[in-house]
């Protein structure tokens, strides 16, 4: 496989990043089960559920906002493969103290499942350590089965689940 080059984003990258296909297709979702076996006890479990058919899931945030706010993000790293921009990872240190959050991770559809997302996450870990943060959190939808599998493969642990009206979010973290 050709070498993946990862570097900070520059202005010329932004139109290319906005045009990446940010949505994804999934055959599974993670479903949360809540049980109350007795007073004062709550058991929460997650189980993988196969969907009756593949589902295309839209990206949860407006991608076009990247054009206006890319310079205000804590970090924005770009992956290049054979001199072509093929993905990016957006980082924020403003959400929680001593923590870097991955708020966006997008890979060009035709080069997915080739290690590019993993390389960007490893680069984000290095960036987070250099920025004196102690945790890296991946923020994702519970429908994003491919991203959840990648996070588990890379050794991330579940650190939260947000079931607010409108958008469910799953957090996976690793200690740096």
Language model region names:
Residues 137-140, 152-169:
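Conserved catalytic-core motifs of GNAT/GCN5-like acyltransferases
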